[in-house]
Amino acid sequence: MVLFSLLLVLAAADADDRLSKKMLPIYVKEVETYSLTVKSAPKQALELKKEPVFEWLNPARNAQQGTIFLWLRNGRPAALACIFSAPNRRLPGRNINHELHALDVEKLVVKRDQYNQWKPQAGLARKQLSDATPPAAARGARLLQMRRLAQEFGGHSLDRDGKRWQLRLLPTPLYRYPAAKSGIVDGALFALMSSAGTDPEVLLLLEVKKVDGNLHWQYACGRFSDWELHVQRKDKEVFASIPSESNPFAHDPLHLYRLYQEKVVTLEGKLLARIRPKNPHVPWGEIVPVKDK
C-alpha cells in the first residue's frame, strides 16, 4: 500500500512537470504582450525577466497551475505578473489568466495591444519598520535578517463561502535585489501562500533604504488574490484586502492589482476562444470561440 501510494505521488508529480513544461512557452508569449515604463521615464522600458521566479499549483481551485515573472527597474522589482491556467469546462483546452501587481514606488505606464488592459493609478507605497533591529552592514547578514523579519508576517484568507485558509510564508524569497551603494541598497520579494495550494496570495517587499548614511528597513504588502485577505505582524494587522465596490474581483482601488481571464488555448498553444470579462465583480467573462480558417 505504501509503495502504491508513493507511485501515485510520483506519477502526479511527473504529470505536473509535463504540464508546466508545455505551458511555459505559452505563458512567456502572454507576458511579452506587455510593455512597461515608469511615469518619469516613459521611453525607458522596464526589463522583463523571462526566466520564471516561481511556479505553483493549486489543486483546491480547479487544478490551477501558474508561473510568476518579474519586470525589473535597475535590478529592483517594478512589477510582477502571474500567468496561470485551469481546464476549461466546455472546450478541450485551458483558460489563460493574467494576474498582475505594480511594485515600483512610481506609477507604471502599461501598454498592451489587446482587449484586456491594466492601468495602475499610483505606485506601491512603502511603510517603515522602525521597531526592527537596524540593518546589518554585511549583505549576507542582511539576508538572514530579512528572512527573520518575513517570518513575523502571517495571516489568513477567506474564500467566497467564508472558509478560512491560513497564510504561511514561502521561506525562500522570490527575488533578491542586487547590491547598490545608494537609495534602496538591498531587499527581497517574499510571498505568503494559502494552505489551499502553493500559489502566492500576498506579496511582501522588504527593503533596506540608505538615508543620510544610515540604513533603515521598509516594507510593502500587496494583494495577490481575489479572496479576502488579512495580514498580521506581531499580532497586529498591517494589511487587509476586503471585497467591496471599489475592491472587486478584478482589481484593487488603485489598480495596482489586476486579474482577468484572457483566452482558452490547447496544450499546444492553439487559440480556441477569447474571453471578454464584462463585470469586475465576477470571475468569469464572455467566451468568444475562434472559428477555424
What are these regions (language model features)?
Residues 46-83, 173-201:
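Exposed beta-strand-loop-beta-strand "reactive/processing" segments of non-cytosolic proteins
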